[in-house]
């Protein structure tokens, strides 16, 4: 895919940003804990979340879908499927399903694409094995394909060494099948969509005021079925917020965006860098929702070292902002970027250099010199949707060719359509 430099300003309202991926995954998986119909409007119709629907269908759920409206009726009993459960590119789907299936009678095989099957799963499989789960896979159950033989699980008191919503949610799901009350704690607050959704579903779970400590009781009855409207994804919206900032004389208003405090840290970083960016809350339901107004802005360099778990998905796009800021910027304490869909630290630095930007990597982050003269280049996405979308936005300024753009469909199927509607010329 080749993106040409955009010659005209952008002034628009975007209401069709992709639905939130985290909430879509959880809606589908948590529906298996209920009885009766679960309904979601604005479900994300991307490869990752469609794979999750296929997984729960193979476990016995009945699914009706009309456009982005999805209805799920869970089975009375989870089936042991006669096929591999394909998670595609989604680490969220695989890690949550490991936790869900560990305590269910049956034999299950989880696999994914070549990228997912090389991402670390021991952070889930190890604590589950310690409470009685039987999980088998390469490198001591660190790499998929993973085979899970459901077992009776023992209660646990687990302190996570990493701040990860995927680890947290997997342990919550396993706790629902344990033989007694379980506790979970983490070093810093990760995304809390699971807690918010499970609270609305009347799950037997208590959360401390700071959100760091959970007490989960085994399920004695099905949870309350869901009927929700899924807001738009702030991580997906971030690319177009960035576009408004870097394009001269431009303004974009992003509508119906999830404004959960654990999801808007990257926007706050842009504000600290000098961006003209306002967030307005319009609705408070099980999640906070609102709109984001962004205008062309001059950015200043910044050091980012806190709340990294809250901006891990936006880090590649933030690196683009760093490259266009005045002065030096760096991001540290972000070693988790090494084990995402690609090694995002190495890949961002490599590709920015190809575009004429001075950049260097650390073990846990990168440093970028802003204000370098940009040059048109061909970059590699390494199959990482967020790398591809980040450089697509940079391409609006200097022109860029991206070697693998199909990966964008895993999370944001209408990204290219929106980019084209802004006036971008795109060749395939």
Curated annotation (Swiss-Prot):
Q: Which reaction does it catalyse?
A: 3-phosphoshikimate + phosphoenolpyruvate = 5-O-(1-carboxyvinyl)-3-phosphoshikimate + phosphate
**Which residues does phosphoenolpyruvate bind?**
21, 91, 119, 166, 344, 386
Top-rank taxon: Bacteria
Protein's organism: Campylobacter jejuni subsp. doylei (strain ATCC BAA-1458 / RM4099 / 269.97)
Q: Which UniProt keywords apply?
A: Amino-acid biosynthesis, Aromatic amino acid biosynthesis, Cytoplasm, Transferase
Q: Which GO terms describe its biological process?
A: amino acid biosynthetic process; aromatic amino acid family biosynthetic process; chorismate biosynthetic process
Q: What start and end residues bound the annotated signal peptide?
A: none
Protein name, UniProt field = 3-phosphoshikimate 1-carboxyvinyltransferase
State a GO cellular component annotated for this protein: cytoplasm
Matching CDD domains = EPSP_synthase (cd01556)
> What Pfam families does the database record attribute to this sequence?
EPSP_synthase
Q: Give the matching NCBIfam families.
A: aroA
